[in-house]
């Protein structure tokens, strides 16, 4: 990963004076393009009174007239919502408003497991049969071409209100109210479902409806849509309303989350409130969450909130459980060497697949699809990716060949498929893997001025908030830091804490999930990237940094060390001039997964520079390869030995060779495409099966006959040790293990001796 500083012209001095901006806030506003009197005035002073006329949104007047007609004539109205925080708040906004207007209004939230996302034909048929005369979708509907058609043909009008991307064909609804409808005149196009619902209710009531802003804000933050433009008004004013809310449901939810009314910010909503609402739909029927938000009874609301708290705790447990099982699958099948992951277990809980896939991407930096089987026998799953790999573009061209259902966007997707298509999908997904744009670049805002840091510094920064999509929380750089008081913390010592000192100032920094850091690595740190927050300890409030990234450089030593042992470090650092590999197959792993610039990667056999600092990232297979790497004139060598070139980590035991051969003789229709499926049945990983088969081919025990693997009827009797491939691999494994396990000082001496020959 590359870090790059944002650049922008400075704010005019008169604007800085008019809005009383400190130097940090002034720089941050300039970087975000909020650099004129009009823009700054909007940022500080705009309220719901400044929102655009709802009538500008596509089909708004038509929708409002139809809703008023239904209310006047006493028609039954059903709000068709969604099971995430956005859909839940949108359903609540619409239901509450129509109830105030005296409508015969009901709501329906589809069940994630039985109904799936969006319009469902069976549920539409039920709603129509139950006497509904008007369906209003919220946070869904644009995919419901057939469902909407069915309702309209049965004299039930459908008003689609949504914000998701239109597909090739739009539903022929009575009205479609959408913030990004082609050609519409509404000036803001990135509302969430709750934002669209709130806009409709403004139009219905001919009022700004500030009492709905707390719900619209939760949907906005939960769905990660823009918090700029009108989104800024929704979130800023919504937080103000939330902090003085009298909704029993929200007050109970806030209490259970351990938050305090009056001091809740956007981070609290994103990490504590929205996830609790999401948890309901992940594990149960999301109607429960709507009941909570609509409740006007304190005791009832607390009872529902307590149930939601149980579900949220269960969601956390299931996420950890499925994640751990996925990591076991990866190692059991040697998939850590792949560029992509497709993980399946029929027992995985469907409600947490997306959360787990996201955690695995964060851990492995690999596009990941996690699959399970539902009660109907359908294999369903969620996928997640990262910047540089468009998941939708990767799967969309092959959806008709492998998938029964598919939808998503750049970095997330949902899909369904037949169970017998999992292995072919895994293979195709891996074969087609390609990262666009090279090394991922992340931007930071500015160098942190270390002198005079106080809690008031954060107040200055927060003038640029509330933060979210489109206005991200600022990231600051601390260059060439002096690090002291370093220690690890947490149950498993996965987190670190230390003090950074520079130019007369210091800052306490916490690094979550940065347990790979240790005292040996601290001299290599050239930049620390942090976001600032407040820490309260024993009633004392202080400023602290939350680490978001690191950059490394070779330390300037008075006496250079020719060889440095970094085998035990769990982090590949971007400080070497050149990263050397013995095996060409490891190049995409280093480039894509380890995020090292391809221009800095070379094969040992092609490298001809001198005087550079180099890192050996994979392990040589033998003494000859190691000698070839060490015959160059380096300034310094870092021994990382992270990857290897071995076909297997260890030679399978003899009984496994017998089991595989027996299986081949008893299954004469076995094809190469079946090897991966057969491996778990035999208690082996895929690489071990391939290794055993290669030995068998060499010894003449098996052959391919018209594309099928069959055993030779009368093979020559000879021991496994007659295989040159087996014996050569065994020797390579021994050499690799020696290099990986040799005591540090002994290894350094050994390599030094080779370089001095």
Predicted region positions:
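Histidine/acidic-residue-rich, glycine-tolerant segments that coordinate divalent metal ions
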Residues: 138-191
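Hydrophobic helix-and-loop "lid/oligomerization" segment in the mid-to-C-terminal part
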Residues: 8-134, 154-155, 172, 205-424, ...
